[in-house]
UniProtKB/Swiss-Prot annotation:
GO terms for cellular component: cell junction; nucleoplasm; nucleus. PROSITE patterns: CTF_NFI_1, CTF_NFI_2. Recognizes and binds the palindromic sequence 5'-TTGGCNNNNNGCCAA-3' present in viral and cellular promoters and in the origin of replication of adenovirus type 2. These proteins are individually capable of activating transcription and replication. The modification Asymmetric dimethylarginine is found at residue 412. Residues 212-234, 282-407, 441-532 are annotated as: Disordered. It comes from Mus musculus (Mouse). Residues 24-217 bind DNA. The lineage of its organism: Eukaryota, Metazoa, Chordata, Craniata, Vertebrata. It is found in: Nucleus. This is Nuclear factor 1 A-type.
């Protein structure tokens, strides 16, 4: 799981920013959504002591796992003071995340009743939670600790009543007689804590010791006079040792303090880190693709990656085909960086050896460029919407309709690609300028075609000659010496120009037969694919 580096804009009202912390599992992204009314209504009723208590237990557990010994009283007291003095914004952010988890675990039909009963607008009624796989009360982690979980009813009592319960105190909880489903009810007003005789007995002496400490040291209490140690033995009062660092009066005082006095959190937008799971679908997070070309190719790649990273969604432009004659997306194809990966490693740039296309051909460039990056499907009547088992590449959604700058690095063609091997063997310099050429089998039959963006769609190459046909070298004009093109095939004033005015545009391609060893000896001047 990765955290988003950017923060989405939100709304502010009543002088406080209302946000909830959201995480979408399918899209694997974090974002911030407007504060949910469930969290906004319950946040003022959460006790601030809950933040201190949960974090104190986590610190003690972490210290014990690291040092293999318990935290000393001085260290524990320092941690307690640090947590009590934490900023209200931090406490409210934590409470918002925890309330979001609780909302998820409460059945939808009981969420409104839960809010109304906690806020005092309705008499207490049962609020059922979603059971676990065994039909029992669910357990959640309150501080993103996978190894430390708390029962939902324990969390409710700590949050809304401020009772310092341990995670193992689930057996001490007692449901009210009015509760109709004690096994799954998480209504705080239906949950009580059982007090045993030992608790009552200890409460008296601990409270007496605490009250005696609050008095003036110069005036010792009567209990201190009676319980003076004799002959070095401990007094009766000293046999009760408190394991915590809270005194009785301090514990009662901090457990009654609300975490938020207002109707919403008051933390700033820049402090937000993450969110809970709410209400935004992955489709709502998608960025709409621009209709015109952008100046930054990085933004285009980022938007394409966002489209590819959301599984289980339909492509953006499914069923919205464009005719080759529509020139709304003709601009922008030449702005793609030449170093970007493409399925057949063919690079297209403005520095190509081809002449500039005529205005009549410009309308089909955007369509032809996008069609070039689609996977080639073999077969006489193959459909572009074939099953993934036919294509031999990952099943992530592929945008198949025309666009100005799509490049899918995840698509891989079959390693035994006849055209690729042929271009690398015969025409290494023209591998970047391959026109509309069919995939050739050993018997010369064509199985698929790669569209050339520099030619309109109606111009198709002639069928390949029979297997015994040999390539015919083209005549060269005697007036100009042959020179090789520079800058990746860029046209120069001294480059040779071949013209065949008597032939039609469809016959201006060199037709080649099956692979033959004699192809290696083809002269240099026959390596130009476009002859017009």
């Amino acid at each position: 799981m990765k955290l988003a580096d950017s923060v989405m804009a939100g709304k502010a009202s009543d002088g406080s920013i209302k946000w909830q912390l959201c995480y979408d599992i399918s899209a694997r992204t974090w974002w911030m959504d407007e504060f949910h009314p469930f969290i906004e209504a319950l946040l003022p009723h959460v006790r601030a002591f809950a933040y201190t208590w949960f974090n104190l237990q986590a610190r003690k557990r972490k210290y014990f796992k690291k040092h293999e010994k318990r935290m000393s009283k001085e260290e524990e007291r320092a941690v307690k003071d640090e947590l009590l003095s934490e900023k209200p914004e931090v406490k409210q952010k934590w409470a918002s995340r925890l309330l979001a988890k609780l909302r998820k675990d409460i059945r939808p039909e009981y969420r409104e009743d839960f809010v109304l009963t906690v806020t005092g607008k309705k008499p207490p009624c049962c609020v059922l939670s979603n059971p676990d796989q065994k039909g029992k009360m669910r357990r959640i982690d309150c501080l993103r600790q996978a190894d430390k979980v708390w029962r939902l009813d324990l969390v409710m009592v700590i949050l809304f009543k401020g009772i310092p319960l341990e995670s193992t105190d689930g057996e001490r909880l007692v449901k009210s007689p009015q509760c109709s489903n004690p096994g799954l009810c998480v209504q705080p007003h239906h949950i009580g804590v059982s007090v045993k005789e030992l608790d009552l007995y200890l409460a008296y002496f601990v409270h007496a010791a605490d009250s005696s400490q609050s008095e003036s040291p110069s005036q010792p209490s009567e209990a201190d006079i009676k319980d003076q140690p004799e002959n070095g033995h401990l007094g009766f009062q000293d046999s009760f040792v408190t394991s915590g660092v809270f005194s009785v009066t301090e514990l009662v005082r901090v457990s009654q303090t609300p975490i938020a006095a207002g109707t919403g959190p008051n933390f700033s937008l820049s402090d937000l880190e993450s969110s809970s799971y709410y209400s935004m679908s992955p489709g709502a997070m998608r960025r709409s693709l621009p209709s015109t070309s952008s100046t930054s190719s990085t933004k285009r790649l980022k938007s394409v990656e966002d489209e590819m990273d959301s599984p289980g969604e339909e492509p953006f432009y499914t069923g919205q085909g464009r005719s080759p004659g529509s020139g709304s997306q003709s601009s922008g194809w030449h702005e793609v960086e030449p170093g970007l990966p493409s399925p057949s490693t063919l690079k297209k740039s403005e520095k190509s050896g081809f002449s500039s296309p005529s205005p009549s051909q410009t309308s089909s460039l955007g369509t032809a460029f996008t069609q070039h990056h689609r996977p080639v499907i073999t077969g006489p009547r193959a459909s572009p919407h074939a099953t993934p088992s036919t294509l031999h590449f990952p099943t992530s959604p592929i945008i198949q309709q025309p666009g100005p700058y799509f490049s899918h690095p995840a698509i891989r063609y079959h390693p035994q690609e006849t055209l690729k091997e042929f271009v690398q063997l015969v025409c290494p310099d023209a591998g970047q300028q391959a026109g509309q050429v069919g995939f050739l089998n050993p018997n010369g039959s064509s199985q698929g075609k790669v569209h050339n963006p520099f030619l309109p769609t109606p111009m198709l190459p002639p069928p390949p000659p029979p297997p015994m046909a040999r390539p015919v070298p083209l005549p060269m004009p005697d007036t100009k010496p042959p020179t090789t093109s520079t800058e990746g095939g860029a046209a120069s004033p001294t480059s040779p120009t071949y013209s065949t005015p008597s032939t039609s545009p469809a016959n201006r391609f060199v037709s080649v037969g099956p692979r033959d060893p004699s192809f290696v000896n083809i002269p240099q001047q026959t390596q130009s694919w476009y002859l017009g």
